[in-house]
Amino acid sequence: MASWGGLLVCTALCAACGRGVPILMYHSVGGDSDPLTVAPEELDAQLDFLESAGFNTVTLREVLDAQDGGKLPRHAVVLTFDDGYVDASTQVLPRLLQRGQKATFFIVSGFCAQDAATRVTKWQKQFLIWPEVRALADAGMEIGSHTVSHLRLSNLSGADLRAQVRDSRATLQSYLGKPVDFFAYPYNDQSRWVRRAVETAGYRGAVVGSRGNSDSFTLQRLTMHRGITPADLRSMLSENWETAYTEGG
């Protein structure tokens, strides 16, 4: 193990997904009162910490490719942003590009309107429109699926479940012209039947919240919420790597 300023990390990252490669789960960036909304200045501090501590942001595709002999940079970390809020374009993307960092954005395809005049507002937040989703992809960001309508999948009939999982991927791939290989379970709802539908739809992997593991369809993430300081993030990442190392990662 090696140490940067008190942060213990595995010097040899495990090729198994989610073990030794922490995945951070963000939602929104802004000034509202939602506890899952991170303030812009907090995101700045977190991204600056990752950069100064020598972390390299990678995509989920790069992590899974490592299972097949692909190479990951040292001290890899995955940044993910769920739901596809407009701040992904206005707040997150500029900050990532400024630092040469990358992230995975999980999009609710049914919430993406064609233009700003018809932009969807839900949960008191505005969502991306299709040209903004394309701009994320064109900037080198990874796009994943978060279903068509952000429903609790275990409550749906088999046909509706399959449609939510399958149609979102198909729509995103058709619009972007590139593969969409990763899925995020809405509400962390991942029953055995839901997982089977995700696998059958052709995804390579899926992410959950804190109740996950290193399995490629239940990849665990660390929840980022309002109030997390760089010192807090240092502790979270240290604990993640300690666990992976102890388990043989």
Model regions and ranges:
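Short loop/turn segments at strand-loop or loop-helix junctions that form parts
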Residues: M25-V29, V108-S109, H146-V148
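Histidine-centered catalytic micro-motifs
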Residues: E142-H150, P186
